[in-house]
């Protein structure tokens, strides 16, 4: 309030300096604004109900962020006389209305009222957000409505425009669903590849048997006897009775179908359950990986076609009534030769083969059925080609990769980056912990390798030193032997020709005792040289 007064005061003091205060309601739109926390909780789907702080009856004035921008633009263009303006849309929504709307359209569909004080424990909510969410104020922007020319984005308010607001939110934050369908013959690696892609993209891995089991379990829960509380309204009881009757009728039809088809469920029920699964909120938010279904052209057509024949989507210049809400964005066609697939199944451990369709008879029958279905012009891949969703063909047999790492890498390259919020705080902490452990293990391995290398080098150095010393001693010994061998003739010569005359000369020198013994000895040797004689 003090800031608003100061701004208005500056405008009154200086005529050339016009100032305005625009009192805006809670802003929504684009990335979600102050309602982003509720959008995120709903989109992630990790809680059974969105929280409503307090009783939720407080009225919150709101305005779309683009409409607020339009109001400000009009203030700049027209410089109106009032310097204090109210900018809100025409809605009168409570906190409960807003949260319930978010939960219904992109979340679990339920809300839970919690104490008002718990709002302060929500770490993603700032004090400014809480002030806007907990306010109870009715406002009407009469001047803006009567005097400004605004192209309203959400004039009627948040609830009435939730579809466009949700679209903005998902596009702004890059949260568009990733929808993938993986098809191929048995044992080609569909499930293992789908499982890895589901982990990487944080998608829902959809397998036919799980969908059927989940749907039947849900129907059985509906028809199971319940204790009805005294406070139930009559209308709610009637609706519940109708749901029970419909569920029981559907269960009876399923039972009859399985009895008539040797335990196999008729396509009409499979398509119904699969379509309900693909239209569920988690699949609409994050996306899905459809594993091995549909198998035929007719199944694909029944699953992905629009239920209302009048609603048709134009696809690149042609009309085709497929349901854009559930149609896959990427279709992966895995394949391999029959010999490769048979060899892969033969090499599977017995514990994996037991109780599955990988037993020899069942596998060969399933492989033969797949080949028979996919030799005609109307295959499941032809359906996707017709709506210009061209499959990504991968020959697993040529990759020579038992773990399918190369196929997964190729698919990730085709599909692109994940479209989600990324890692949660817990996942980041886990990733950091794993990275730290890997770093420590790597450093320890490098240190051990370095020590081992140093020890090996030292051992080699000592061995080389010992070898060198050994060879040096050998060389010295050989040199001594050579010198000794070479000195024998010289010694013989000395003993024969030199030493007798030298001894006589020394004896004579001792007898005579000349003044210069050396000259005397030299003269004696010269005179008495045997060779000279």
Swiss-Prot record:
Q: Where is this region: LID?
A: 347-357
Coiled coil residues, start to end: 419-487
InterPro entries of this UniProt entry? Adenylat/UMP-CMP_kin, DD_AK7, Dpy-30_motif, NAD(P)-bd_dom_sf, P-loop_NTPase
Q: Which Pfam families match?
A: ADK (PF00406), Dpy-30 (PF05186)
Q: What is its EC number?
A: 2.7.4.3, 2.7.4.6
Map out region (NMP) in residue numbers: 207-265
Q: Where in the cell is it found?
A: Cytoplasm, Cytosol; Cell projection, Cilium, Flagellum
Q: Which terms in the GO cellular component ontology are assigned?
A: cytosol; motile cilium
Per UniProt, which keywords does this protein have? ATP-binding, Cell projection, Cilium, Cilium biogenesis/degradation, Coiled coil, Cytoplasm, Flagellum, Kinase, Nucleotide-binding, Transferase
Q: Which reaction does it catalyse?
A: AMP + ATP = 2 ADP; a 2'-deoxyribonucleoside 5'-diphosphate + ATP = a 2'-deoxyribonucleoside 5'-triphosphate + ADP; a ribonucleoside 5'-diphosphate + ATP = a ribonucleoside 5'-triphosphate + ADP
Please list where the region (Adenylate kinase) is annotated. 177-426
GO terms (molecular function) for this protein are: (d)CMP kinase activity; adenylate kinase activity; ATP binding; nucleoside diphosphate kinase activity
Chain positions recorded as ATP binding sites: 187-192, 397
- Name of the featured protein: Adenylate kinase 7
The primary gene name is AK7
